Amino acid sequence: MHGSGSLLACLLPPLLLLGAAPGPAGALSEEEKHVMVELHNLYRTQVSPPATNMLQMRWDEELAAFAKAYAQQCVWGHNKERGRRGENLFAITGEGLDVPLAMEEWHHEREHYNLSAISCAAGQMCGHYTQVVWAKTERIGCGSHFCEKLQGVEETNIHLLVCNYEPPGNVKGQRPYQEGTPCSQCPLGYHCKNSLCEPIRGPEEAQDLSSLVPEAPSSLATEASSSRREGIDSSLATEPPPFLVTEVSGSLATKVLSSVETKAPSSLVTEDSPSMATKTPLSLATKVPSVLATHSLLSLDKRPATLLPKSTHDPIPKSADKEASSTRMPSRIPESSLHPKISLMGTREPLPLSQEEGEAEAELAHCSEILASVFPAQEKPGELQTTLKHKGHSSSKSLSNSPSASATANAVGGRTLALQSSLPDAEGPGKHGFRSGSNASPGHVGGLLLGLLLLLPLVLAGIF
């Protein structure tokens, strides 16, 4: 029995490393979702001049599922079926998706936007920025996907990020927000928090949270409770970790016995059979960092996440967040890669004309009208207006296949393509282009296979 425990101790670190590696699908982690919401709210509090009616942004799983489904199509262009949803796009080559870089690229457009005139500088784009700081938008959901081939782009192996928003921004003739004293015009039912209008939540908020957390399969809950009873000392059950108490929904908690509330990593007990759990030494179970043991209950692709290093943040800023704040890991902003990267950025296409619903002031104009009010006019229908920048000089071109470099991308040795949305009848996969000599991302499948080959001798040694 002791030998089996030693084998598990040897196998655990490489297994955790494999689990931490991003998969081919490139789904957003819980920490990335949290960072996305936090950066949106940070930039919304930093608008200058300040806003009187800026609502607090929160995560929406339905929007996230919608964005994920479109990202999986691997198309470099806006979703024509998005209805009354705002949309921002971003794509990048390299080792993985860089959420802070995407947000920085979108926010960088503020330098070209004139709030008083409700206009954007000639030859520039501002649609990303105005959507990020649109005061009446309060829900966001994003999805990402690793595309070996992105339709409409010549480069391969690209991480595509799609974010959808409700209510949508970039409405013709309207300012992103009203300038003045922060929170002085918060809607009824909202109160001020960090210069943002936050909804006043009641006791029923915990019940609302449970509806957003997918229930675990009954077989998984039974296996978890069985293995934990057999393999974990009952004395540990007296100290349930806070993140299990505050962030697991009521519907899920009723399916798992009270012995679930232990310090043992959930990834170990849900993946191993009961017999394996009985052989795991207690010292091993308690030494694994809890950040590696947290379980993603809000996976975009609805699959249970296991053996992945995730934050304990719930991406939806609800009342439970206050109780769990002491256990949350700090947001970590990924450092810029030393390898050259290529990032692509797509503006939020003006909203299509649709049926009247929601607020009266959110009436949407025809795409061509909104295009004229938000973005500079194009020389020909269907052309993409981009700006090509290099360190030695700069030039502005209106081309359907031209890269655009930003200062941020240059700082990390890469280039950025900004997608200027064309009119709906001219939009198509062939209308958006991308060219670059920068390197493509390393093969994700090759790295995973190499790790599995390294683990095979260890597993065989433990069996025989």
UniProtKB/Swiss-Prot annotation:
Residues 208-241, 260-281, 304-347, 386-412 are annotated as: Disordered. Keywords: Glycoprotein, Protease inhibitor, Secreted, Signal. Interacts with PSP94/MSMB. One of its GO terms (cellular component) is extracellular space. Residues 395-411 have a biased composition (Low complexity). N-glycosylated. It is found in: Secreted. It comes from Bos taurus. This is Peptidase inhibitor 16. The gene is PI16. PANTHER family: CYSTEINE-RICH SECRETORY PROTEIN-RELATED (PTHR10334). May inhibit cardiomyocyte growth. SMART domains: SCP. One of its GO terms (molecular function) is peptidase inhibitor activity. The keyword Signal applies. Residues 1-27 form the signal peptide. InterPro entries: Allrgn_V5/Tpx1_CS, CAP_dom, CAP_sf, CRISP-related. Pfam families: CAP. Belongs to the CRISP family.
